[in-house]
UniProtKB/Swiss-Prot annotation:
Its cofactor is Mg(2+). It is found in: Cytoplasm. Mg(2+) 2 binds at residue 418. The gene is lysS. Pfam families: tRNA-synt_2, tRNA_anti-codon. It comes from Actinobacillus pleuropneumoniae serotype 5b (strain L20). This is Lysine--tRNA ligase. Belongs to the class-II aminoacyl-tRNA synthetase family. It comes from the Bacteria.
Length: 500
């Protein structure tokens, strides 16, 4: 018999034993009651009483009611020690036969297994080793666990188990619980930041007839009642800018986007973004906003502006570097000159030398962008704003007044990864229509990620969009940074996984 077969046999035997215990408990009453009300949490009890001496604690006679999942147990005849875990942490219980009503220890406590959820009432005391413990006078099984907790290898280090059965990961892995607490703080901190700056939070369609706002491949579905193909949105941008046209001068949406593309340590097809738009502002204002936001998040979440991430330490306390795409290529491109990047033929030659496959639809801007991604992107470790992107790859961004070949756009890079994208918005309806037409031509030439033309959005621009700047920030990638998580799957509770 193989090791796997032995494990399955052991699991089946364990589950059978637990079901037999559950059957006996049912004979005594409902083994899944809903009447227990706790008044204390493990973390707060430790914070308040860990430093109190045992005698002083005894004199205070502190009564508590706690509940949680059994993580450890030590049975010593007529008494047992259990460690239970609630949302805040763990605390030890001392359950002795003589401290309970007659028959409770033998008939009920003896049925407790690892993974069961229990509620107890009792008095705080310190053990001989000084551990804060609840001496239980009342106990109640709240939920019988029919499956045993995973062992250490399965529960804490096996990635498949962690991602597919996140509930087991959260039970077993304190670091995972911390990661998702940090993610929650990132989301709430961002929302509060924009609300305090008088932004209005809005919701725009997830199902769209025309997917727009980003260069990406969408998911397609069909609306039966309307008999029309629809798309899961790739970005809320065009709807949010319609709202600015309508007079909402500061809007944001914190929600999901969907892109039918690859899965990697940086990409999940379903992801969360904050996208915001501010009238009477430009892309410089948004870069300032972004610095302020990330600095505040670092302090509020970690208590410092220096954030460790893998082999790096990011410094959010210093002004972020600001560099143009062309200057970044020259800086890191090992001999590439600005004159090279102004020539389509020379840029194509450089790109091919770097092993880049040139697409038929590419102009100079796309080639320059591909060169940047190859030679410079991974070099932008400390928080850096990359600016002045070619107009060809920025169909929704305003052209720069001094050099119309580039746009008033920036991308935020941290650790060599793009975290955000923003720009002064294109509010010239005629220019926007022409750029949409160029995107349609690229799509017809085989570019799956080229944008669709949104005629209604052009009509909205014809009514007048005030000078506006907008930005999108990836929540998942920010959570990765603040939680020091190497993969996007580590910060998404239920990431996309290939079917078994």
């Amino acid at each position: 018999m193989s090791e796997v077969e032995h494990q399955e046999l052991d699991l089946n035997g364990e589950m059978l034993a637990r079901r037999e215990k559950l059957a006996k408990l049912r004979e005594q009453g409902n083994p899944f009651p809903n009447t227990f009300r706790r008044d204390a949490y493990a973390e707060k009890l430790h914070a308040q009483y860990d430093e109190v001496e045992g005698e002083a604690l005894k004199e205070q006679d502190i009564q508590v009611k706690v509940a949680g999942r059994i993580m450890l147990k030590r049975v010593m005849g007529k008494a047992s020690f259990f460690t239970i875990q609630d949302v805040s942490g763990q605390i030890q219980l001392y359950v002795a036969r003589d401290n309970l009503a007659e028959g409770v220890y033998a008939d009920k406590v003896s049925m407790w297994d690892l993974g069961d959820i229990v509620g107890v009432a009792g008095t705080l005391f310190k053990t001989k080793t000084g551990e804060l413990t609840v001496r239980c006078s009342e106990v109640e099984l709240l939920t019988k666990s029919l499956r045993p907790l995973p062992n250490k290898v399965q529960g804490l280090t096996d990635q498949e188990t962690r991602y597919r059965q996140r509930y087991l990961d959260l039970i077993s892995n304190e670091e995972s619980r911390r990661t998702f607490m940090i993610r929650s703080k990132v989301v709430s901190g961002i929302r509060q930041f924009f609300l305090e700056k008088d932004f209005i939070e809005v919701e725009t369609p997830m199902l769209q007839v025309i997917p727009g706002g980003a260069a990406a491949k969408p998911f397609i579905t069909h609306h039966n009642a309307l008999d029309v193909d629809m798309y899961l949105r790739i970005a809320p941008e065009l709807y949010l800018k319609r709202l600015v046209v309508g007079g909402f001068e500061r809007v944001f949406e914190l929600n999901r986007n969907f892109r039918n593309e690859g899965v990697s340590v940086r990409h999940n097809p379903e992801f969360t973004m904050i996208e915001y738009y501010q009238a009477y502002a430009d892309y410089h204002d948004l870069m300032d906003n972004t610095e302020e936001l990330l600095r505040k998040l670092a302090i509020d979440i970690l208590g410092t502006t220096t954030v460790p991430y893998g082999e790096y330490v990011f410094d959010f306390g210093k002004p972020f570097e600001r560099i143009t795409m062309h200057d970044a290529i020259v800086k890191y491109g090992n001999g590439i000159t600005r004159e090279d990047l102004d020539s389509f033929e020379k840029s194509v030659e450089i790109a091919k030398g770097l092993g880049i496959e040139i697409q038929k639809s590419w102009g100079l801007g796309s080639v320059v962008n591909a060169i940047f991604e190859e030679v410079a992107e991974h070099q932008l470790i400390q928080p850096t704003f990359l600016m002045a992107h070619p107009a060809e790859i920025s169909p929704l961004a305003r052209r720069n007044d001094e050099n119309p070949e580039v746009t008033d756009r920036f991308e935020l890079f941290i650790g060599g990864r793009e975290i955000g994208n923003g720009f002064s918005e294109l509010n010239d309806a005629e220019d926007q229509a022409e750029r949409f037409d160029a995107q349609v031509a690229a799509k017809d030439a085989g570019d799956d990620e080229a944008m669709f033309k949104d005629e209604d959005f052009v009509v909205a621009l014809e009514h007048g969009l005030p000078p506006t700047a907008g930005e999108g920030l990836g929540i998942d990638r920010l959570a990765m940074i603040f939680a020091n998580a190497p993969s996007i799957r580590d910060v998404i509770l239920f990431p996309a996984m290939r079917q078994k």
